[in-house]
């Protein structure tokens, strides 16, 4: 199915004549029926009865007022504006139980903030497991001071994603369960490009286009390339970079790139654009799954859409080598270092969970931001935020290093809300834990972004300044891992936040409708802030001696035993039929 690019991917911005404005959005979040891969029709989450949701275009300095009404009926919802710093508007960031309450069915939440950045972003639900069901889309912020103004003729937006046929509540129930003790993530059913397959994008010969690339998927990173065309990377995650040529890019879930691509001067043929899911992430490789999605640059409507050529190896550009245009130098030595070790393991309910330093994230009874605002001087003590939020309190202005050691055999894209960070070190695969006494020289002008990959059994070091008071999640952006607990909470300058931030009354009304507490510690205790009795916690640890393989063996042994007992019971309850008079009992032997 060909899709007209004007509907999904293209907008031409006369950037020199635009000015900041107040943009109003009135969104009704509803269920819609869609079949984006042409294989399976299913319910998806749309906006105002439409799916895919609209690609948004802002100008730097715009004020956004988005009224979000939950008309789903059977699920709560939320909207996270991915990549926006929300400096001074932490309560508009979007994650439920972190900076707001869940928007219950029938409730309306108003997001009201000013856009202070430019580049490529996206918006998506941050309610548990929800955005892969469709509530996600690209967002682009233009800027008259964009360093590449005048070097391109038009802009295009290309989203990449994986796609599932089952809805997320069903998938999550089986994923986080005793029947999946190894934590094998569900494998997608398809890859999509702009929420479809066989996308066509009309181009004109000789023109240069600025392509905004966004991975809005739940799980799969994708390799992306355009046959017989060179891309020049000029932006990652809202950070403009010096142009770097690339033939292939690796885009993890939540990452964004802007690339300049100059068209050929002839129109005899069209060229394939390919997104290829990284199958290293998958525990199983279904024979029926096409890991690739193809679109085409259409120079000539009458010419064929060629089948992409096979590639002998995936060799993407290494984003560590990118250099920001603004020349921000390496921050000074860290005032505070946070070391996070990533593991996957089972807890007492038999299910597999994800951990930072042995802690799996569990949402508190009171949103963490609301705890900050209602605990007075105790807000500087991590204990009030609950053990399983993995709280880390930062002082304003401190330089912070995040040292992450990946003890897992898979890749992980990690995202920090409220900031971009300098990526000052990143190891190869199987390098083990970071050794501060034995590392290469840090780059003088490090690459910055808000989502970065750690390699299997590898490590990285991120550095940022705590200059944005707020409550900011740091989490894996593979949705399966986020939902199984791979998250921590940075509480940045909490006492400053108390002086400057006020929650709007309509936000409290949303909390009341959802039955969410809005004051006190993580357990909702307002009298004794250090009494966490009743706080939400993870399942108890697994009894000593149990392993994932042991659980599998135990589960199947129990199933086999139950089936055996049922068979015996069924046989024992069956009626015994005596031979009729005059009949001859059967005899299996063959006698003559």
From Swiss-Prot:
One of its GO terms (biological process) is reductive iron assimilation. One of its GO terms (cellular component) is high-affinity iron permease complex. Cu cation 2 binds at residues 82, 124, 477. Glycans are attached at residues 28, 74, 87, 112, 194, 198, 265, 292, 438. Residues 1-20 form the signal peptide. Pfam families: Cu-oxidase, Cu-oxidase_2, Cu-oxidase_3. Keywords: Cell membrane, Copper, Glycoprotein, Ion transport, Iron, Iron transport, Membrane, Metal-binding, Oxidoreductase, Repeat, Signal, Transmembrane, Transmembrane helix, Transport. Cu cation 3 binds at residues 126, 417, 475. It is an enzyme of class 1 (oxidoreductase). GO terms for molecular function: copper ion binding; ferroxidase activity. It comes from the Eukaryota. The chain crosses the membrane at residues 550-570. It is a single-pass type I membrane protein. Its main location: membrane. Cu cation 1 binds at residues 80, 415. Residues 571-592 are cytoplasmic. Its EC number is 1.-.-.-. Residues 29-145, 154-300, 362-494 form the Plastocyanin-like domain. Induction: Expression is up-regulated during iron starvation and is controlled by the GATA-type transcription factor sreA. Cell surface ferroxidase; part of the reductive iron assimilatory system (RIA), a siderophore-independent high affinity iron uptake mechanism. Required to oxidize Fe(2+) and release it from the transporter. Belongs to the multicopper oxidase family. This is Iron transport multicopper oxidase fetC. It comes from Aspergillus fumigatus (strain ATCC MYA-4609 / CBS 101355 / FGSC A1100 / Af293).
């Amino acid at each position: 199915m060909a899709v007209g690019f004007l509907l999904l991917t293209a907008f031409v911005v006369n950037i020199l004549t635009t000015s900041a404005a107040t943009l109003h959005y009135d969104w009704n979040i509803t269920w819609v029926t869609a079949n984006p891969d042409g294989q399976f029709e299913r319910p998806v989450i749309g906006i105002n009865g439409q799916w895919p949701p609209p690609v948004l275009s802002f100008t730097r300095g715009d004020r956004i007022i988005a009224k979000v009404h939950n008309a789903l009926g059977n699920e709560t919802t939320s909207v996270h504006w991915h990549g926006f710093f929300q400096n001074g508007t932490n309560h508009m960031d979007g994650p439920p139980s972190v900076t707001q309450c869940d928007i219950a069915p029938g409730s309306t939440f108003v997001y009201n903030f000013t856009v202070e950045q430019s580049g490529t972003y996206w918006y998506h639900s941050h309610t548990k497991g929800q955005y892969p069901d469709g509530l996600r889309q690209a967002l682009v912020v233009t800027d008259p001071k964009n360093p590449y103004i005048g070097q391109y003729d038009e802009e295009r937006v290309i989203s990449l994603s994986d796609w599932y046929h089952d809805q997320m509540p069903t998938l999550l129930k089986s994923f986080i369960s005793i029947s999946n003790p190894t934590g094998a993530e569900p494998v997608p059913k398809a890859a999509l490009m702009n929420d479809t397959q066989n996308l066509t994008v009309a181009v004109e010969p000789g023109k240069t286009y600025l392509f905004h690339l966004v991975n809005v998927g739940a799980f799969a990173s994708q390799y992306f390339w355009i046959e017989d065309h060179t891309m020049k990377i000029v932006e990652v995650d809202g950070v403009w970079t010096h142009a770097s040529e690339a033939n292939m890019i690796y885009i993890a879930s939540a990452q964004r790139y802007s690339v300049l691509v100059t068209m050929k001067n002839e129109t005899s043929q069209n060229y394939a654009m390919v997104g290829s899911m990284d199958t290293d992430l998958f525990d199983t490789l279904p024979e029926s799954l096409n890991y690739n999605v193809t679109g085409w640059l259409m120079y000539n409507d009458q010419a064929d859409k060629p089948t992409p050529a096979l590639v002998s190896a995936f060799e993407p550009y290494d984003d560590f080598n990118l250099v920001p245009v603004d020349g921000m130098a390496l921050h000074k030595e860290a005032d505070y270092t946070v070391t996070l070790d990533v593991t996957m393991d089972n807890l007492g309910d038999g299910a597999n969970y994800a951990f930072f330093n042995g802690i799996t994230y569990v949402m508190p009874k009171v949103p963490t931001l609301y705890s900050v605002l209602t605990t007075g001087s105790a807000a500087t003590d991590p204990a009030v935020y609950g053990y399983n939020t993995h709280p880390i309190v930062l002082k304003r202005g401190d330089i912070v290093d995040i040292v992450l050691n990946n003890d897992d055999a898979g890749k992980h894209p990690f995202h920090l809300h409220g900031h971009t960070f300098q990526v000052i070190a990143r190891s190869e695969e199987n390098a083990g834990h970071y050794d501060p006494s034995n590392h290469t020289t840090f780059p003088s002008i490090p690459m910055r972004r808000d989502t970065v990959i750690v390699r299997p059994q590898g490590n990285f070091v991120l550095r940022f300044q705590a200059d944005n008071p707020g409550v900011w999640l740091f989490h894996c952006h593979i949705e399966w891992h986020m939902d199984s607990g791979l998250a921590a909470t940075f509480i940045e300058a909490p006492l400053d936040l108390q002086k400057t931030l006020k929650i709007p009354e309509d936000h409290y009304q949303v909390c009341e409708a959802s039955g969410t507490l809005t004051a006190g510690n993580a357990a909702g205790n307002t009298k004794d802030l250090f009494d966490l009795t009743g706080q939400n916690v993870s399942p108890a640890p697994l009894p000593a001696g149990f392993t994932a393989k042991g659980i599998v063996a135990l589960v199947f042994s129990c199933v086999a035993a139950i089936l055996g007992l049922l068979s015996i019971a069924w046989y024992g309850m069956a009626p015994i039929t005596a031979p009729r008079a005059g009949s001859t009992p059967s005899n299996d032997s063959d006698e003559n």
